[in-house]
Amino acid sequence: AIKDSLLSAVIIEAVVLATRSGQVVLYQLTDLGRQAALAHQIDPGPVPRESLEHRWWVVQARHDFEKKGYEVTLEHPIQGNGAVDLLAVRPGETIVVEVETGKSDIKANLSHIKRSQYDKMIMIATSPEAVSACQKAIEKVGHHPELPAVELLTWLDIS
């Protein structure tokens, strides 16, 4: 009842994510919800830099890599200016992982990562649209023999 009231008052909004086994519904504050919280002297926290969808899939990817024996660092700084969503390390292997919702500049992200030296690069697309966008970006950036190829995974591979 409370959730429905908050939804109808546009204080929160639902974010529906497809998973291998169905879907997950997450909720986040709207701008109106942030204003309402502040009006009642409740700190809504900082405005997230990333979408709720992106943050959720980064956590899922972290759990997936940890289950496979990797030590995982979130928002790992890379050469130049920026960070990758995940750095997964285990003896003899270092992997950079980018979670892509299809809403960012995938080609720029990919080009930036390719300049860094890692054993493997993985992009995780979170939807069919993101798969398409990632495939196009990978084709545009191309493969360089001295750099590792990009492996494209989907939400079905980690959910």
Question: For each of these PLM feature ranges, what is it?
Answer:
Residues 38-80, 89-91:
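Acidic-basic catalytic patches of nuclease active cores, encompassing PD-(D/E)XK
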Residues 80-96, 102-104, 111-117:
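Active-site beta-strand-loop-beta-strand hairpin of nuclease catalytic cores
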Residues 128-159:
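Domain-level recognition of nuclease-like catalytic cores that cleave nucleotide substrates
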Residues 20-23, 79-83:
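Short acidic/glycine-enriched loop/turn segments that link adjacent beta-strands
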Residues 75-78, 98-102, 124-128:
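Structural motif
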Residues 1-57:
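Interdomain/boundary linker segments immediately adjacent to catalytic/signaling cores
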Residues 19, 33, 124-131:
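Short beta-alpha junction loops
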Residues 11, 93-96, 117-126, 150:
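Hydrophobic beta-strand segments of well-ordered beta-sheets in folded domains
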